[in-house]
UniProtKB/Swiss-Prot annotation:
Quaternary structure annotation from Swiss-Prot or TrEMBL: Homotetramer.
A GO molecular-function descriptor: FMN binding
Pathway this chain belongs to: Metabolic intermediate biosynthesis; chorismate biosynthesis; chorismate from D-erythrose 4-phosphate and phosphoenolpyruvate: step 7/7
SUPFAM superfamilies: Chorismate synthase, AroC
Record gene name: aroC
BP terms from Gene Ontology: amino acid biosynthetic process; aromatic amino acid family biosynthetic process; chorismate biosynthetic process
Keyword NADP: yes
Stated name of the protein: Chorismate synthase
Reaction(s) this enzyme catalyzes, per UniProt: 5-O-(1-carboxyvinyl)-3-phosphoshikimate = chorismate + phosphate
CDD domains: Chorismate_synthase
GO cellular component: cytosol
Length: 360
């Protein structure tokens, strides 16, 4: 299986499976002399790790990261940074009854048809467990960007819609997001979401979500025309996350309903200060950052592993039914928030380094 590497100048390769002994990544292209310790990575992994609330999978993983290379005396050396996270709480026996069956909506069918073999234990490589390695890589990108761009730089993500219940993003509050188990930016939605998701969990079903990621303190000029557009790479990054089925940049699909006057973000200058009257472009024009807040949202489909009995086939081409036991997220979108933040950080650093190489 190829295509496990993401990025150009700053790139990472992830490895490992859901029920294997460990997973991890190798980060290449990180600048030297950046202060980095395991705790810098751990704090991001702790946002994503399972078993932290009744609203996520009850699989218990500490997700303790170890830095194996690329850091000396607390600083990056410019050489590849290798990271490892050991798996602890696997229950492969939960999948014994379905090892020959394809879960509807999951990658089981396509993996088997393409490769002729698949790891049925927790989905193997197609499991959202793989995203722990991305979050680790994103934590390194975040450290570099904070060093290069300063205190104004920030990437923050939130769940803005849980199933059929959306929140008012005009009430977005960064401080609220990390104080609730949903990464919800609007405290008024918390009780509604709690009841909604508990009912879904009790029924044995699942729901989808919409996640929004915002990046602030980004300079003008990141990205390049045509085949290296910043929004193109951000969209690719978000679409690579497990279960993501759609991405919007700025107004996204809604921009098709706007008039030219409504959609255009008018610009004015007051002294040395540039002002945009709106941000339908999501902080990117012509594939290049405008200096505004970059706003990206993506839709995550409902978790495919559910208790409800469904029709399917087995690997021998026979009709059968399936009901998936085990421990699964009733909404995988919740834990996708730190993954989206990580991928945003990786893309931004990649383009920052490419821009420095070409234009500095």
């Amino acid at each position: 299986m190829s295509f496990n590497t993401f990025g150009k100048q700053f790139r990472f390769t992830t490895w490992g499976e859901s029920h294997g002994p460990a997973l991890g990544c190798v980060v290449d292209g990180c600048p030297p002399n950046i202060n980095l310790k395991e705790q810098d990575i751990q704090v991001e992994l702790d946002k994503r790790k399972p078993g932290q609330s009744k609203f996520t999978t009850q699989r218990k993983e500490d997700d303790k990261v170890q830095i194996l290379s690329g850091v000396f005396e607390g600083k990056t050396t410019g050489t590849p940074i290798s990271l490892i996270i050991y798996n602890q709480d696997m229950r492969s026996k939960d999948y014994g009854d379905i090892k020959d069956k394809f879960r509807p909506g999951h990658a089981d069918f396509t993996y088997f048809k393409k490769y002729g073999i698949r790891d049925y234990r927790g989905g193997g490589r197609s499991s959202a467990r793989e995203t722990a390695a991305r979050v680790a890589a994103g934590a390194i990108a975040k450290k570099v960007l904070e060093n290069k761009l300063g205190k104004k730089f920030k990437v923050v993500g939130a769940v803005t819609q849980l199933g059929i219940l959306g929140c008012d993003t005009r009430k977005w509050n960064d401080l609220t997001i990390n104080k609730n188990p949903f990464f919800c930016p609007d405290k008024n939605m918390l009780k509604l979401w709690e009841k909604y998701l508990l009912d879904i969990r009790k029924s044995g079903s699942s729901c989808g979500a919409v996640i929004e990621v915002r990046a602030r303190g980004i300079p003008v000029g990141l990205g390049a025309p045509i085949y290296s557009k910043l929004d193109m790479d951000i969209a690719s990054a978000m679409m690579s996350i497990n279960a993501v089925k759609g991405v919007n940049i700025g107004s996204g699909m809604n921009s098709a309903q706007l008039s030219g006057e409504q959609n255009s973000d008018e610009i004015s200058q007051k002294g040395k200060k540039l002002k945009f009257d709106s941000n339908n472009a999501g902080g990117i024009l012509g594939g290049i950052s405008t200096g505004q807040e970059i706003v990206v949202s993506f839709a995550v489909k409902p978790t495919s592993s559910i208790l409800t009995t469904r029709k399917t086939i087995n690997k021998f081409g026979k009709n059968t039914t399936i009901s998936v036991k085990g421990r699964h997220d009733p909404c995988v979108g919740i834990r996708a928030v730190p993954v989206g933040e990580a991928m945003m950080n990786c893309v931004l650093l990649d383009h920052y380094l490419m821009n420095k190489a070409q234009c500095s």
